[in-house]
Amino acid sequence: LTEIPLFEEEFLLIRHINDANKPVPNNKELTNMKLLLLEEGHCLRSQTLSFCKVTSVPKNIMEGTALTTLVQMVSSGIGVTLIPEIAVPFETRSAKVSISKFLQQKPKRAIGLVWRKSNPLLRQFNEIAVLLKNLNKTSI
């Protein structure tokens, strides 16, 4: 496989709108909150748990099957969740939630483009990677 790293993306904290003025919790404090995660096997779930530095799944979590579901659960006051920054405008557009960036330890993930070395579209994938890297630089 060929991999080209494109950019790093932060996860943002999604809380009920009534929590907008509360301090942003750190990763340890997050484990004491009602954490809403995607179901077992999803990479965002494992990335969130990794940020919280937990070795086993906390008992106080609830699961959803999609980011939209998690955001709606937050909007209903059920708990808090983390979602990728790139998904925030779409997923939170009509939800009554507050969006916060973490202040110190910032959860993030690497985004890249991966393809088989034998793929006949090698040149096009490289061009797409350059475009995506440049697009990300202009959007910051």
Which residues does each PLM region occupy?
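Short beta-strand-centered segments that line the small-molecule binding cleft or hinge
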Residues: 1-11, 15, 24, 75-78, ...
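Short secondary-structure boundary/capping segments
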Residues: 2-5, 21, 26-28, 89, ...
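Residues at the C-termini of beta-strands that transition into short coil/loop
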Residues: 7-10, 17, 39, 65, ...
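A bilobed periplasmic-binding-protein/Venus flytrap-type ligand-binding module shared by bacterial periplasmic
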Residues: 14-19, 110-121
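Secondary-structure junction motif
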Residues: 21-25, 33-55, 121-129, 136-139
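Hydrophobic hinge/microswitch elements
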Residues: 41-100
